[in-house]
Swiss-Prot record:
Cofactor: FAD; (6R)-5,10-methylene-5,6,7,8-tetrahydrofolate
Gene3D superfamilies named among the record's database cross-references: 1.25.40.80, DNA Cyclobutane Dipyrimidine Photolyase, subunit A, domain 3, HUPs
Location of region: Interaction with DNA: 275-282, 342-343
Classification of source organism: Bacteria, Pseudomonadati, Pseudomonadota, Gammaproteobacteria, Enterobacterales
GO MF, one annotated term: DNA binding
Organism: Escherichia coli (strain K12)
Class in the EC hierarchy, top level: lyase
Protein's name according to its UniProt entry: Deoxyribodipyrimidine photo-lyase
Function: Involved in repair of UV radiation-induced DNA damage. Catalyzes the light-dependent monomerization (300-600 nm) of cyclobutyl pyrimidine dimers (in cis-syn configuration), which are formed between adjacent bases on the same DNA strand upon exposure to ultraviolet radiation.
Binding residues for (6R)-5,10-methylene-5,6,7,8-tetrahydrofolate: 109-110
Any one of the GO BP annotations: phototransduction, visible light
């Protein structure tokens, strides 16, 4: 008998799952599913407890959904990726597996694991799929057959390639001829977990699909006007579903174009499409530049920047106690919810690196440890952009003023007051510099003074980058 094994990783869904669809194409084959938890590896990669909770819930939903299709989900737990190779080999042997199907992961450790799995399964046909991207790495290259290093030409080439042939979404599998089965006992991951707001970050696949549809109908067209203002619900909040594979990027693209057909030609919805393309760009980059997965900067000379070691400043930033309200409100949102508005990710990252002169890798690590939507490629890309160490990054002399950023994107301080209750009584726009108001009003605030003076910090940071650039 032909036996197909689907190895689930970051693709916890039935709809538009390329590996699952391929495994189920042969109606006479026996189909099994496998998920391997690797807690020690997750800890090494700084997976957040909220993302672990989301994965745990999605796994249990997936197990039930697969059982309804007649596909049992086998759950195994080992320490790390190295040990998972033996588990795949063992499961294949125990179940006489003839074909293994899985969706590619592009991070360096994951790719090394998959090479070892294919090497170990000499008598099993292994098929991998580019499921977590719309266009696979290698599909969008320069005229010299190199990976693009600048986003805009990549985007233009990506759109040109997309118009030549848009990848379709594949349907969820039908019930196997053997009929539905009883699901196994519920899964509990042996990893720290933390609850989150399921209204913002849905667990069920159908709820994630509904959230996508609602955003594309009602939010994508206004995304360009609303996306930078954290007090407004102007973003999709689909990042967590994309990070764990509860949704596919193809589903996002097709739904967007169904609701906003002009998005492909620069019309309404095109700015959100740009965000999907940025996601593709960073995934393609880590495939062709695996050193990015190893905490190396893309621009080599930036590794010579003399970062400051200041645990007190790092802790103040992590806890949202820097004395800069927009930075602190953003960090408290992150710590409280496991999510942060994208504009605020740029502001807080810039502050850590260019006001505190703390190594961007400290911020990259902390974000991953807190984010429900933690994604190595996107998180690394964002941090290297803010730190001016990455490809197509902000120039090193571009340094956000945290006060003016707050005034620009949270003009009346609505977001700040939501997350900093100690500033709720500070009136109007002066909430961006509460220490000045408190001094004039003769009021004592339960809120810290700024831990650095921005103008002085800017001078110090520019000098540090200049010295590194000149090799001093």
């Amino acid at each position: 008998m032909t036996t197909h094994l689907v190895w689930f990783r970051q693709d916890l869904r039935l709809h538009d799952n390329l590996a699952l669809a391929a495994a189920c194409r042969n109606s006479s084959a026996r189909v099994l599913a496998l998920y391997i938890a690797t807690p020690r590896q997750w800890a090494t990669h700084n997976m957040s407890p909220r993302q672990a909770e989301l994965i745990n819930a999605q796994l249990n939903g997936l197990q039930i959904a697969l059982a309804e299709k007649g596909i049992p989900l086998l759950f195994r737990e080992v320490d790390d990726f190295v040990a998972s190779v033996e588990i795949v080999k063992q499961v294949c042997a125990e179940n006489s597996v003839t074909h293994l199907f899985y969706n590619y992961q592009y991070e360096v450790n994951e790719r090394a694991r998959d090479v070892e799995v294919e090497r170990a399964l000499r008598n099993v046909v292994c098929e991998g799929f580019d499921d977590s991207v719309i266009l696979p790495p290698g599909a969008v290259m320069t005229g010299n057959h190199e990976m693009y290093k600048v986003f805009t030409p990549f985007k233009n080439a990506w759109l040109k390639r997309l118009r030549e042939g848009m990848p379709e979404c594949v349907a969820a599998p039908k019930v196997r001829s053997s009929g539905s089965i009883e699901p196994s006992p519920s899964i509990t991951l042996n990893y720290p977990r933390q609850s989150f707001d399921t209204a913002h970050f849905p667990v069920e696949e159908k709820a994630a699909i509904a959230q996508l549809r609602q955003f594309c109908q009602n939010g994508a067209g206004e995304y360009e006007q609303q996306r930078d203002f954290p007090a407004v619900e102007g973003t999709s909040r689909l990042s967590a579903s994309l990070a764990t594979g509860g949704l596919s990027p193809r589903q996002c693209l097709h739904r967007l174009l169904a609701e906003q057909p002009q998005a492909l030609d620069g019309g309404a919805g095109s700015v959100w499409l740009n965000e999907l393309i940025w996601r593709e760009f960073y995934r393609h980059l880590i495939t062709y530049h695996p050193s990015l997965c190893k905490h190396r900067p893309f621009i080599a000379w930036t590794d010579r920047v003399q970062w400051q070691s200041n645990p007190a400043h790092l802790q103040a930033w992590q806890e949202g106690k820097t004395g800069y309200p927009i930075v602190d409100a953003a960090m408290r949102q992150l710590n409280s919810t496991g999510w942060m508005h994208n504009r605020l990710r740029m502001i807080t990252a810039s502050f850590l690196v260019k006001d505190l002169l703390i190594d961007w890798r400290e911020g990259e690590r902390y974000f991953m440890s807190q984010l429900i939507d933690g994604d190595l490629a996107a998180n690394n890309g964002g941090w290297q952009w803010a730190a001016s160490t990455g490809t197509d990054a902000a120039p090193y002399f571009r340094i956000f003023n945290p006060t003016t950023q707050g005034e620009k994107f949270d003009h009346e301080g609505e977001f700040i007051r939501q997350w900093l209750p100690e500033l709720r009584d500070v009136p109007g726009k002066v909430v961006h510099e509460p220490w000045k108001w408190a001094q004039k009003a003769g009021v004592t605030l339960d809120y810290p003074q700024p831990i650095v003076e921005h103008k002085e910090a800017r001078v110090q940071t520019l000098a540090a980058y200049e010295a590194a650039r000149k090799g001093k």
